[in-house]
């Protein structure tokens, strides 16, 4: 947990040292961080470090942490807690979360940076999906197609004929 305290402390110190210039510009200079990793022989952990320096950890009931526009992609990420998928399906769910957020908020969009950590590997695989990626275009098309198809499978609303 000491590692999670460090970026919070440094962030507060930086904001304090630039308080005057931040006030002039109208910015607050605060930052929120997601910090994750594993010490060899211990379980991996993920922390959400707030601008004030305090933090929360992921848990079995909440295995994901979000920064930024947290309200838009939450449904998709909660699927991970219900389904407990393998890594491949989990990544698709994460991309679904990012795509739904881009649809709901104009200030969010690609590139999407994805970091994958496999337990005990002590290495992150980092990937970037650019806005002009053929893969991104394909999954956007497929998500819309399948979501629209799922609507056809839902029962009619009882009062829809009124």
Q: Which residues does each predicted region cover?
A:
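N-terminal nucleophile
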Residues: 1-162
């Amino acid at each position: 947990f000491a590692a999670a305290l460090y970026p919070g402390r440094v962030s507060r110190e930086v904001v304090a040292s630039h308080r005057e210039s931040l006030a002039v510009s109208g910015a607050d200079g605060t930052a929120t961080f997601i910090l994750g990793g594993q010490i060899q022989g211990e379980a991996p952990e993920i922390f959400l470090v707030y601008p004030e320096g305090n933090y929360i950890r992921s848990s079995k009931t909440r295995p994901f942490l979000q920064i930024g526009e947290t309200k838009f992609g939450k449904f998709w990420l909660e699927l991970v807690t219900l389904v407990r998928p393998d890594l491949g399906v989990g990544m698709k769910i994460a991309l679904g979360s990012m795509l739904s957020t881009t649809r709901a908020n104009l200030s969010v969009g690609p590139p999407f940076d994805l970091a994958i950590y496999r337990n005990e590997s002590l290495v992150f695989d980092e990937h970037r999906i650019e806005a002009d990626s053929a893969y991104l275009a394909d999954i956007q098309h497929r998500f819309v197609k399948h979501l629209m198809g799922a609507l056809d499978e839902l029962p009619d609303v009882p009062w829809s004929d009124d």
